[in-house]
Amino acid sequence: MGSSSSRVLGQPRRALAQQEQGARARGSARRPDTGDDAASYGFCYCPGSHKRKRSSGACRYCDPDSHREEHEEEGDKQQPLLNTPARKKLRSTSKYIYQTLFLNGENSDIKICALGEEWRLHKIYLCQSGYFSSMFSGSWKESSMNIIELEIPDQNIDVDALQVAFGSLYRDDVLIKPSRVVAILAAACMLQLDGLIQQCGETMKETINVKTVCGYYTSVEIYGLDSVKKKCLEWLLNNLMTHQNVKLFKELGINVMKQLIGSSNLFVMQVEMDVYTTLKKWMFLQLVPSWNGSLKQLLTETDVWFSKQRKDFEGMAFLETEPGKPFVSVFRHLRLQYIISDLASARIIEQDGIVPSEWLSSVYKQQWFAMLRAEQDREVGPQEINKEDLEGNSMRCGRKLAKDGEYYWCWTGFNFGFDLLVIYTNGYIIFKRNTLNQPRSGSVSLRPRRSIAFRLRLASFDSSGKLVCSRTTGYQILILKKDQEQVVMNLDSRFLTFPLYICCNFLYISPEKGIENNRHPENPEN
């Protein structure tokens, strides 16, 4: 489906016979085919001939003998044509109904008035609408009225949307432009046109992009299209960080951003610190929507603005101020333990003064106990899949591969002595536990075996942000010896589309029961 789509909508064919009967009664005399009728109308029909000739005055009959030989020759030539199929395009019944009954309003038995316009329609067609079916079959006073004034309380509905909605009752297909789909959906929901509602949903799902996603998401929350809402969330999870956009940041509301940041399916680029940076830029644009700079300028302008706020609020954490309180519920979904595990990131988040120090203190304590367990308590990593732990507490990180080639990288941060090296080569994605073979700035664990829980996802997108291809390992437990390599995904590089995006979830150490999690209880007011 491109910018528009179509869907077959059922029509009451019984109504067709009733409406066409009147149209035929008004028609003038038909054109005759043969015999005396033909003569009276000035036409001559010659058997075997292909032409009808108009006479001047009375009918002039043809001499069959004069044409016999010619007809025999033509008959021989035309014999093959008798066995050759031919097509003749007939006028569509649906088009006839739409033009004659809807656009022209012939044989109308009811007039619908709304938004300063009127439509001459037919009750038998309107009964396809749940709204009008109830009106005409119930005890409403409108059931016996010939003129009905419709009140339109929904501001999304306009005259053009009503035109499409009413017209859908008279035709087999409806073309819906993405720019008009929200208004048409609103009209379809009001009139209870299930077929048109479904088609609007399909149009939305096929045309989600950076310009439409927020408008679609808002509208389907109102009108209850859960499948479209799910598609919008999937698009946002995939594109929020991989294809950052100033306009998108401005349009994303607090509730939807809370869902995105809290999800383990967020396609993170780089590390959790970049999730924090994305949130910081988004919050700035929510507070200063008039800013119209470029994406490259955004982070610098954001840091300057929050620096001024720190001075104005005398060192108070921004999320504790009145302007910052509405954003608390979103920032609580940050996985702070993976930010403070890197020195540079820990310094930045402390200096920004956005997150309250109490939040950070509890995470420092939690990570200190986890480090002691890894060093002194024979902790070798997760031994079984705990989906709740993985989805709520795993490290989120990612990488963009611009083109095919060989890549070697590791993500920053202290991971309890587990130095994981990621390799992409010839369509293989390999995890290697680095201990002695590669240089390492921090300490590494020399335990014979270490285990991690992980999930790897791979994706590529088209220009609209739609998923072109994707692969996932699902959640797994991987046990590696010192300097051991393990292929975790095998791809056919001939069929890969670049740039390629790789996103991983890791859990290096199991959360200890009884130790407070870094996730803060939700404030009901937020």
From Swiss-Prot:
Note: According to some authors, GMCL2 is a GMCL retrogene on chromosome 5 which is likely to be functional.
Main localisation: nucleus
Name this protein carries in UniProt: Germ cell-less protein-like 2
Keywords per UniProt: Developmental protein, Differentiation, Nucleus, Spermatogenesis, Ubl conjugation pathway
Coiled-coil ranges per UniProt: none
Gene: GMCL2
Biased composition (Basic and acidic residues): 62-77
Gene3D superfamilies linked to this entry: Potassium Channel Kv1.1, Chain A
Keyword Nucleus: yes
One MF annotation (Gene Ontology) recorded for this entry: cullin family protein binding
PANTHER family assigned: GERM CELL-LESS PROTEIN, GERM CELL-LESS PROTEIN-LIKE 2
Tissue expression summary: Expressed predominantly in testis.
Keyword Transcription: no
Alphabetical list of CDD domains matching this protein: BACK_GCL, BTB_POZ_GCL
Species of origin: Homo sapiens
Region (Disordered): 1-85
A GO CC term assigned to this protein in UniProt: nuclear matrix
Endpoints of the signal sequence: none
InterPro entries recorded: BTB/POZ_dom, Gcl-like, SKP1/BTB/POZ_sf
BP terms from Gene Ontology: germ cell development; protein ubiquitination; spermatogenesis
UniProt superkingdom: Eukaryota
Source lineage: Eukaryota, Metazoa, Chordata, Craniata, Vertebrata
Listed pathway(s): Protein modification; protein ubiquitination
Span(s) of short sequence motif Nuclear localization signal: 49-55, 85-91
Function of the molecule: Possible function in spermatogenesis. Probable substrate-specific adapter of an E3 ubiquitin-protein ligase complex which mediates the ubiquitination and subsequent proteasomal degradation of target proteins.
Domain BTB: 108-178
Assembly: Interacts with CUL3.
Pfam name, any one: BTB
